[in-house]
């Protein structure tokens, strides 16, 4: 038997020394959000940290970790003083529960969003679509880790190769950083609004800028404020430079991307100096980012989320009350009556705090510089087209008088240092001259058919706007049934799914464009994005050739902004309205008269010398020619695809209603089957029963669905022929055999020449003249 070893004396087990750390100096890591989650709410942007305990000492939350922990650098650690309360190590040997790794939406790069299948009738269906694998978050942790003192590191702004941009250098004294970025982005010369706005804005005066859609308004106000960011880079105590408000989240993210692209060398060391603060993303992360030194010097925000941040932290009110520039992008939408009351509250909070600073001699003697930009500044444009009221006669002698009236309206809502300088680069018309408008007349129940006809006859990248979300969902399924790639975006979708749809649409459009460029003889297909008016303002989607108004918009300003999604950056595009006879007598007439008002004024002034009569509103938009023989061949396909779309949407809706009812009954301990009779007899549920019966009538049994799909696929496999020609390919006015051999003519319609909506409208205009 061996002897027991005696315990050694004098040795004591020492616990690792603990320290209290600041939460803003921890190396937080983003967590990955799996695609299996349909809606993760406000947890997008969630971040985690391991090896840190949370203690509440005297009612104050503190973060405690071991001295040898790797959660932050040694230089950032603070030792616990002798007079501080010792913290027990409660971590013990218990293994930490594994957390699901999600990836922050803010950190998803372009191209990483999944390219899913095209069929998606509802937002919930999109969550189940198989998506491509995301990159391993461990590979790019360093890109998102919030390192310390990143804003205090020096950057050599002059270490940039010189460029030759005479039109930009003659415009204003721009830094080499911006000139180099403009050169890299191939912005070789400024647009008209940029030429007139940038020098005036850099003088510090208030500006109201009006320009047509796609004319470069973002850089018109973006370049001056980025110049301030670059000039203030070496200062230690940096106050906020600019607050930019946009009406939609998508526009806020787009403006953020544009500003970051023109100051990439600065953001390489100060990546959070330009921040986007919008709803739908984690407010906790946004609060933490704002606590970092010199972060958020330029903030692009939606009013709702920014007001929420101000009310949660009063120090932000004092901080942003010292801002130099206040910018309203799409200002007409922000300041409409009944919209965005949050913006008025924000201005009130900042003004009260700024006046306090002025009394204490902490702030400047004047208020911030105010810049407002939009494509539409007219009170008439906000009138509802569906209203039965007559259009008010608000004719002005000239465009300047009208804008002065608009300024008086705006000054009642926001504050200026003085009367703003008016810069109007589009006084002659409200719709961009690069947009060719057209009208498609159709029966009220055949909008789908005429929309399908347009996409078949004029393939390309198309954006379709609907007034109702239900129409967006149905049209998406309808076009997918016909083999046309279609994506959807509307206000009921979460922010993640909106961005996914936009990314997929851009990827599919770029893919089809590459195929057509490399092989001109390949079959050209349409790529379609179907949207509600959430995508009508400000979004810069490259390569959109056509805009279709499935429904006439509710007001004229919405029509202008919808149409402005095409013909951007100097290109031309087509805007087509699908209109029924009932609409042509009311909303269409009011729309065209409102748009023709300004032109008619200038025409009236010129008619005194030329003796020409003003153009009637009926003649301001040409009809798109419709070939009835091709339309008749598409009719049966359209009918089958529409019935299948109604069945799919109704079935999904009924399934969700049943699941919700069963879940609620289980939680309450109620037998659903026994209460169905009582529910059916209740007068209060009559509307619900009628709605359910309508959905039931649209459903089809499985056997009939299979038969209809087989019939539809068979019809889609049969090529469309012009004039229904089935025999004698070498006869007639067009030699079909020769066109087939030489791969000439329309890709989808045999015997038809290649068509282009833009060229078709131009030719028709020449014939009319």
Swiss-Prot record:
Domain of life, source organism: Eukaryota
Coiled-coil intervals: none
EC number per UniProt: 3.6.4.13
Subcellular location: Nucleus, Nucleolus
Helicase C-terminal domain segment(s): 448-611
Enzyme class: hydrolase
Keyword Repeat: no
Any one Gene Ontology BP term: rRNA processing
InterPro entries the record matches: DEAD/DEAH_box_helicase_dom, DEAD_box_RNA_helicase, Helicase_ATP-bd, Helicase_C-like, P-loop_NTPase, RNA-helicase_DEAD-box_CS, RNA_helicase_DEAD_Q_motif
Principal localisation: nucleus
Comp. bias intervals (Acidic residues): 83-99
Enzymatic reactions: ATP + H2O = ADP + phosphate + H(+)
Biased amino acid composition, Basic and acidic residues: 73-82
Domain notes per entry: The Q motif is unique to and characteristic of the DEAD box family of RNA helicases and controls ATP binding and hydrolysis.
Family membership: Belongs to the DEAD box helicase family. DDX24/MAK5 subfamily.
Protein name: ATP-dependent RNA helicase MAK5
Organism: Saccharomyces cerevisiae (strain YJM789)
């Amino acid at each position: 038997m061996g002897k027991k070893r005696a315990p050694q004396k004098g040795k004591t087990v020492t616990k690792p020394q603990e320290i209290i750390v600041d939460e803003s100096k921890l190396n937080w890591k983003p967590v990955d959000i799996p695609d299996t989650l349909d809606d993760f709410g406000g947890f997008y942007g969630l971040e985690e940290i391991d090896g840190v305990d949370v203690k509440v000492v005297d009612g104050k939350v503190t973060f405690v970790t071991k001295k040898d922990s790797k959660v932050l650098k040694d230089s950032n650690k603070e030792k616990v003083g002798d007079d501080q309360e010792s913290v027990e190590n409660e971590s013990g040997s218990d293994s930490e529960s594994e957390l699901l790794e999600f990836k922050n939406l803010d950190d998803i790069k372009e191209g990483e969003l999944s390219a899913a299948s095209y069929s998606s009738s509802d937002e919930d269906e999109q969550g189940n679509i198989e998506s491509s694998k995301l990159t391993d978050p461990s590979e790019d942790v360093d890109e998102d880790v919030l390192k310390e003192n990143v804003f205090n590191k020096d950057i050599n702004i002059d270490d940039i190769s010189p460029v030759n941009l005479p039109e930009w250098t003659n415009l204003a004294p721009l830094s080499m950083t911006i000139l180099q970025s403009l050169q890299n982005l191939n912005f070789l010369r400024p647009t008209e609004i940029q030429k007139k706005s940038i020098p005036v804005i850099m003088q510090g005066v208030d500006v109201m800028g009006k320009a047509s859609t796609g004319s470069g308004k973002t850089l018109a106000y973006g370049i001056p404020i980025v110049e301030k960011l670059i000039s203030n880079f070496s200062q230690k105590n940096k106050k906020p430079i600019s607050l930019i408000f946009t009406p939609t989240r998508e526009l806020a993210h787009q403006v953020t991307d544009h500003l970051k692209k023109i100051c990439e060398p600065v953001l390489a060391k100060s990546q959070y100096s330009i921040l986007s603060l919008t709803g739908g993303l984690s407010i906790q992360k946004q609060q933490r980012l704002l606590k970092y030194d010199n972060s958020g010097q330029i903030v692009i925000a939606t009013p709702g989320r920014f007001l929420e941040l101000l009310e949660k932290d009063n120090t932000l009110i004092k901080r942003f009350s010292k801002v130099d520039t206040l910018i309203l992008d799409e200002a007409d939408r922000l300041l409409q009556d009944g919209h965005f009351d949050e913006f008025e509250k924000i201005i009130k909070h900042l003004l009260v705090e700024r006046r306090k600073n002025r009394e204490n001699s902490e702030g400047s003697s004047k208020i911030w510089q105010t810049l407002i930009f939009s494509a539409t500044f007219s009170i008439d444009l906000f009138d509802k087209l569906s209203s039965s009221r007559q259009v008010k006669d608000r004719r002005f002698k000239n465009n300047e008088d009208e804008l002065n009236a608009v300024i008086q309206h705006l000054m009642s809502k926001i504050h200026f240092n003085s009367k703003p300088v008016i810069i109007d680069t589009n006084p002659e018309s409200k719709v961009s001259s690069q947009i060719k408008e057209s009208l498609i007349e159709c029966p009220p129940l055949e909008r789908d058919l005429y929309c399908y006809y347009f996409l078949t006859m004029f393939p390309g990248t198309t954006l379709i706007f609907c007034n109702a979300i239900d129409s967006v969902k149905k049209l998406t399924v309808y076009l997918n049934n016909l083999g046309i790639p279609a994506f959807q975006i509307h206000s009921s979708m979460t922010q993640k799914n909106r961005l996914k749809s936009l990314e997929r649409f851009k990827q599919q459009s770029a893919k089809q464009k590459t195929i057509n460029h490399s092989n001109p003889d390949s079959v050209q297909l349409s790529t379609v994005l179907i949207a509600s008016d959430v995508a009508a303002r400000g979004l810069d989607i490259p390569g959109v050739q056509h805009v279709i108004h499935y429904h006439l918009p509710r007001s004229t300003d919405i029509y202008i902004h919808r149409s402005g999604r095409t013909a951007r950056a100097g290109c031309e595009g087509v805007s087509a309205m699908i209109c029924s006879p009932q609409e042509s007598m009311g909303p269409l007439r009011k729309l065209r008269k409102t748009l023709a008002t300004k032109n008619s004024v200038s025409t009236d002034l010129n008619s005194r010398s030329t003796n020409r009569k003003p153009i009637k509103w009926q003649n301001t938009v040409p009809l798109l020619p419709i070939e009835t023989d091709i339309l008749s061949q598409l009719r049966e396909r359209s009918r089958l695809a529409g019935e299948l779309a109604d069945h799919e949407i109704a079935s999904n809706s009924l399934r969700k209603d049943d699941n919700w009812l069963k879940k609620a009954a289980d939680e309450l301990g109620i037998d659903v089957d026994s209460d169905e009779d009582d529910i059916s007899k209740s007068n209060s549920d009559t509307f619900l029963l009628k709605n359910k019966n309508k959905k039931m009538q649209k459903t089809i049994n499985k056997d009939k669905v299979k038969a209809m799909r087989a019939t539809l696929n068979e019809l889609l496999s049969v090529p469309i022929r012009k004039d229904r020609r089935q025999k004698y390919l070498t006869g007639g006015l067009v030699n079909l055999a020769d066109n087939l051999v030489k791969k000439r003519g329309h890709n989808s319609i045999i015997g038809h020449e290649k068509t282009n909506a833009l060229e078709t409208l131009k030719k028709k205009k020449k014939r009319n003249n």
